């Protein structure tokens, strides 16, 4: 159906099983999961699909090596299982990618090797190659432009890489094949309630400037860093459930890497992780982790972030990138779940949480691309428990 036909479909006063607010990774995933079970689904995205965080990732499908230091083994295990599933299920937009951790201090080689062996162990019977220690010559072979002053060797491991925006569009198209109806440039302005229970939404189509009343049995809020604004349409709460964090990436020319392998800086002076990742004819450098107060759909990189990335990655290149070598910059916002016990965003977990309000609104926050499928499945499972009719069939994904 074209856009006009879709809105005519809404005007028939159909009551959908699910209304999903938000057309990023989680929203599209929920639309696909629910529609594949046989439920009727309408999804509304205020901007374009994957306009926000979901198209501004580091392009990695990974378990999260850095979470091992925080003993978040369950999170790593789930992410590694989902990594393998996603690689098999979407092989046309994913690929394996090798990384090297260059080592300049003797004991660190074994420290990183031990951590990555634990990563291998948690991944179980994965089809990814196992990590291994490599000597200085091999590091230079894999990373021709690496700074070899004081280089002692390194550790090599593999993870997944993907095209985030293309995967998002593919998920949306697949959901439509299962019968879901997806709308972009359509914002939810208010809820329709009966006896304080949500029964639908009022949607503004920014293309035609029309308002549509759309009814449903379940409404799921999947708006990422903007989740609080949708919750506030339901009820005012003084407590924010989201603590947004900004991540900036620099894109430089491929000549600075000269390899199909990337490298990982496991610990910067302030305890963060940085990547240099081959991406088509370019190299992605990133990312930062800075708290922000008010989320924006088009966040702007800060000069301090640009300087931070360049300062830390320069130490690892022989031919060093300068500001004039930056081809483009992109910035995304992480929808981290707020935790009063953690003062810094870099210490917050990438775990997701699912909230249900008294009115029946389900909000899912947190998570990342790697685990989008599992998060979507759990969210729809919870919604099904609230839904009076049983699922026509089980999740097929």
Residue ranges and their predicted role:
Residues 36-54:
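Glycine-rich FAD pyrophosphate-binding loop
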Residues 59-142, 274:
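Dinucleotide-binding Rossmann-like beta1-alpha1 core, especially the glycine-rich loop
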Residues 103-178, 183, 194-197, 280, ...:
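Flavin (FAD/FMN) cofactor-binding and adjacent substrate-gating region
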Residues 210-218:
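Core beta-strand elements of the Rossmann-like FAD/NAD(P) dinucleotide-binding domain
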Residues 221-235:
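Flavin (primarily FAD) binding-site architecture
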Residues 1-18, 36-37:
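Extreme N-terminal leader/targeting segments of oxidoreductases
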Residues 241-242, 256, 264-284, 291-389:
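C-terminal catalytic lobe of FAD-dependent flavoproteins
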